[in-house]
Amino acid sequence: MKDIDIRLQTGYFEHFGTLCLDSLTSYEKSVIGFGMGNRAGEAPQHRKDYNPAKVYIENYIRKLMNLPCDLIITAHLRKESKLLSVDSSSGIRYEEITYRLYTIGQAVVTVPLLFDEVYVLRGKGSPPKRYIVTDALGEYIARSRLKRNGMLEAEEPPDIKKLLKKAGFSSEDKPRLPKENTIDKIN
């Protein structure tokens, strides 16, 4: 977070239209590894490692959300299945399958709650035709205030600029940074 603080002081993020953290799933593993320090190689412990990591990740995301630019965070999905029943004669299992954010513990629930827009990128066919799911359709957990307000459809093309424009927001790029390096202001 120190790097973010330094960049905030220099006005670095005022030159960004969008900041992307790719991916939360990988970032979480780094946070846990850093938190474990000299215990590297051991299995992470729930209270000692996972809970502090979850709090750190949530606080870091809140800090990123306060930047003067749009924020996109990508993450992997994890398949979760819930057994509904088993047919006694055939042995066929009936399960409810959902795909949720792949992160630690309760962050599966708490991190998505920080966002107004939670989308899932899907693909159909071969080669896959990509589209963004903006609403909970079957097994994918997505939601959108913009969709709820009638600005977006349940499935949209995978173009963030077009989504912004469709919802009535500016999709213009910010001007390029001048040749001098913003980091030089620190030195």
List the predicted regions and their residue ranges.
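Conserved GTP-binding G-domain of TRAFAC-class P-loop NTPases and closely related GTPase folds
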Residues: 79-187
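P-loop NTPase motor core
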Residues: 18-110
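Conserved, well-folded catalytic cores of nucleic-acid-processing
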Residues: 7, 27-30, 74, 114, ...
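Short glycine-rich substrate-engagement loop in P-loop NTPases that contacts/grips substrate
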Residues: 1-12
